[in-house]
């Protein structure tokens, strides 16, 4: 019987492919997000891992006087500005892991992509995702944990309407920076605004498109929780000069790869496995209560029938 190879008129794809090199991508990690919150926060370096927020006590008692007119000789008020005696101190928190890489793997399989570089890249991306999650949800320093009851409001009818966002703006009216919510929350607001005939304006930031309300961008983050068909809208004012919300990091780390992030080689064990310590130091401070407000109980599962 004649073999299949003898019947072929030319070299086949399977055999030819043994001499070809495929173009290979770096590993793709589906959990990576843009992490817009990390980009939009102002980051402040701290000393010794501690950031103390000094606030004024009883600001309404600071007395000044405006003269009623020329020729008045009423005595001027006397005043002083008092400070808190036990101000809040924010301590940097650690997000870390030990990355293990077999030396045989890094020696033999690092072309065209270096194995150590890719393992570190994916580990660092995962740590930064956890960082954004902590900045939103940490019970100690997260945005949701630091909002005061006076700065928390509920929706009028469940779904996020323009009226709801207007009410939220009244809580952070001193130069608000951005809304932060889950992508489902942005979609829900877009539906409500469009249904009412006021579709949101779109702006371009960092090469991406965002819808806005009253000129304030709505920033998506999957770290904002969605539970039982409800999420939250967070309105933030950022920056130290504006008495807003700031991110905190430790500068000058050994093995620093990015602000607050270090990678250190810790050694090779008897199994020829190399270990790297990847550490991120981070926290978040709210300088004044009116720098942050939350719209609660935002329904994301309401839809409209357009006719």
UniProtKB/Swiss-Prot annotation:
GO terms for cellular component: cytosol; encapsulin nanocompartment; plasma membrane. Shell component of a type 2A encapsulin nanocompartment. Forms encapsulin nanocompartments about 24 nm in diameter from 60 monomers. Probably encapsulates at least cysteine desulfurase (CyD, AC O32975) and allows passage of cysteine into its interior, probably involved in sulfur metabolism. Expression in M.smegmatis generates a multimeric protein, whereas expression in E.coli does not. The N-terminus is blocked. Has 4 domains; an N-terminal arm not found in the type 1 subfamily, a discontinuous peripheral domain (P), an elongated loop (E) and the discontinuous axial domain (A). It is a peripheral membrane protein. Dominant antigen for this bacteria, could possibly be used in vaccine formulation and/or for diagnosis. Protein expressed in M.smegmatis stimulates a gamma interferon-secreting T-cell proliferative response. Belongs to the encapsulin family. Family 2A subfamily. Homooligomeric. The encapsulin nanocompartment is formed by 60 subunits; monomers form pentamers which assemble to form shells. There are 12 charged pores where the pentamers meet as well as 3-fold axis channels and dimer channels. It is found in: Encapsulin nanocompartment; Cytoplasm, Cytosol; Cell membrane. Keywords: Cell membrane, Cytoplasm, Encapsulin nanocompartment, Membrane. It holds the Pfam family SrpI-like. Transmembrane segments: none annotated. It comes from the Bacteria. This is Type 2A encapsulin shell protein. The keyword Cell membrane applies. The keyword Membrane applies.
